[in-house]
């Protein structure tokens, strides 16, 4: 497969995530809105380029006529590794992707959608250490007790999730850290994904 431009890679990632979350690909208008294009026509041009490179198939006559090409080359791209996440930006925005690791997403359950570089030691007591690569399954909801990647206002954090009424507690696994308390009546919180595994940085090159 021919190499992708950064913008093409970003659109391909958006398509894959949309299918994983909703079961269907985005429309051209949705792609344009998510990525700041002035019109759906701009998205269409990028889709045509992705089709020429063998990443997707375009199905005429339908607004969601995009199908991922299940090629060996596409699978070999691996999981995107997310580094520092800028405030207010989508976690899978192309500028956050440091590289791709040749990791089989299905070695985790549920399957991983991306890797997140761990910063800090707030989860060290359950073996999530500074510099580790956290395998994350993209999700928008969580059950109490699950370890989540959460966005509180503009900050992204990895913590254990607990919800009581309209209050969410994001617990560290390190006694040196107090829980992050989020009042959902006046603070924004979104779940970016669920932790499904850890790769010790250096063990997978």
UniProtKB/Swiss-Prot annotation:
Its EC number is 3.4.21.88. Residues 28-48 bind DNA. Coiled coil: none annotated. The active site is at 122 (for autocatalytic cleavage activity), 159 (for autocatalytic cleavage activity). Signal peptide: none annotated. One of its GO terms (biological process) is SOS response. The keyword DNA damage applies. It catalyses: Hydrolysis of Ala-|-Gly bond in repressor LexA. One of its GO terms (molecular function) is serine-type endopeptidase activity. Keywords: Autocatalytic cleavage, DNA damage, DNA repair, DNA replication, DNA-binding, Hydrolase, Repressor, SOS response, Transcription, Transcription regulation. The record marks 87-88 as: Cleavage. It is an enzyme of class 3 (hydrolase). PANTHER family: LEXA REPRESSOR, LEXA REPRESSOR-RELATED. Homodimer. Belongs to the peptidase S24 family. Represses a number of genes involved in the response to DNA damage (SOS response), including recA and lexA. In the presence of single-stranded DNA, RecA interacts with LexA causing an autocatalytic cleavage which disrupts the DNA-binding part of LexA, leading to derepression of the SOS regulon and eventually DNA repair. NCBIfam families: lexA (TIGR00498). This is LexA repressor. It comes from Shewanella woodyi (strain ATCC 51908 / MS32). The lineage of its organism: Bacteria, Pseudomonadati, Pseudomonadota, Gammaproteobacteria, Alteromonadales.
